Curated annotation (Swiss-Prot):
Identification of the protein by name: Protein Wnt-5b
PTM text: Palmitoleoylation is required for efficient binding to frizzled receptors. Depalmitoleoylation leads to Wnt signaling pathway inhibition.
KW Secreted (keyword) present: yes
Gene3D superfamilies (alphabetical): 3.30.2460.20
Source lineage: Eukaryota, Metazoa, Chordata, Craniata, Vertebrata
Native source species: Danio rerio (Zebrafish)
Intracellular or extracellular location(s): Secreted, Extracellular space, Extracellular matrix; Secreted
Gene name of the encoded protein: wnt5b
Amino acid sequence: MDVRMNQGHLLLAVTLIVCNSQLLVVANSWWSLAMNPIQRPEMYIIGAQPLCSQLTGLSQGQRKLCQLYQDHMVYIGEGAKTGIKECQYQFRQRRWNCSTVDNTSVFGRVMHIGSRETAFTYAVSAAGVVNAVSRACREGELSTCGCSRAARPRDLPRDWLWGGCGDNVNYGYRFAREFVDAREREKNYPRGSVEHARTLMNLQNNEAGRMAVYNLANVACKCHGVSGSCSLKTCWLQLADFRRVGEFLKEKYDSAAAMRINRRGKLELVNNRFNPPTGEDLVYIDPSPDYCLRNETTGSLGTQGRLCNKTSEGMDGCELMCCGRGYDQFKTYKHERCHCKFHWCCYVKCKRCTSLVDQFVCK
């Protein structure tokens, strides 16, 4: 009897350890590189702990890539930070506003759900890495890449030169794919399982984010000639402003496709009346949780205490933002520049004005 009980306790303990370790794998993410400053390779101190062993949230494959490309890690962190900031900007007027909760899981349990919001977060963070690494190549910060070697566009006028130092989007795309997707490709879940569906979802959204940066990159040119006559132009490939990438992905979020896993272990549309998603589209497998109220299980932070716009009928309006709970009004001082004048030559001088304004927060 005692032996059976001990075996039962042992089995329960092992089960709990396995479950907790799986949760830890989900919770820890390379996104945490955005939350903690990364030491640049040239700043290493003799006898200090190696860089890659200090970084939390990396999978086994990502840690190997870290060891091979240590000078890239700063820019992966910068890319993750860029993605998080853009996520917070795009969702600043939504019930879920891309809030970070800690330095390890970054977004908390809300990312355990395969929702539209999770899809956007994966896409925009992958896009951030492409953006940061591509630019670092152009600036000569990385040992394995340089200026863009993209082919001359066919529609570029013959008398325009092609060959300025452009952003190396090809390299940024390839490296981001290897690094960001490494965690997903290491997983070996049973084909057709819920976990397998989530892995496929993550890979699709990572690719959509990378493709957004790749496809939005455009040709930039500079004029040469006497007195700016522009008798000659030099052109190169340039990244789009990341705000444009964020807006593009936000549109993809609004039109994201609901998917499910089929018997063959592939994602398929829940509603066959819609066109299947392309490589540039976002997909999700779970409905979004209720973001109105705080919920420890789903990771929702709720909207209590959020600022709202009393006169707006949109998502930032008090009626929708506060989920019908009502709102409180208070007065606060607003400081801003005013009475600005241009002085010759050449600066603008402003006064600092203070006004008392009404603000509204959700109950």
